[in-house]
Amino acid sequence: CQTADIVFLALHGSCGEDGRVQATLEAFGIPFTGANYLSSAIAMDKDLTKRLVAPLGIHTPQWQRVTYAQEDIPALVNDTALPVVVKPLMGGSSIGVSIARTPAELTAALEQCLDMGSSTVVLEQYVSGREIQVGYLVDRALPSIEIIPKSGFYDYENKYQPGAAEEITPA
């Protein structure tokens, strides 16, 4: 890599998205495409990202960061307004994300996160509506895309299974 003019990053997954590769390239002075290591690392932390964008006037659903153990689940379920979106604090691709509409679903979602090794989650107010994504590149917005899953919500399976979701451009 030391002779590379530039590294074109086309990575997916925790090591490719959490800033580690970017930090290594920056440490060696190798130019690369995409966000720097700090931006990548921050974006993986859902609570930190929300706290940083709120003062900029970017609205997100109400949320709370919760660290818990198995024995805390009954009280947490009792104290949480439903429906709620349960998200592991760190990570991407909607891995481990659930929408809980009942106490049983919330219990299962919290247990799933613990099974994945995530004892800290973001509990986010559920907002129903259309899912529309708009990418931003340098100084311009890209065309909007409406995403319509064939079933459920736009979770990991619907993102990566061919034909599981319809994408309409422009939205």
Regions found by a protein language model. Give the residues of each.
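Short small-residue beta-strand/loop micro-motif enriched in glycine and branched aliphatics
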Residues: 34-35, 94, 166-169
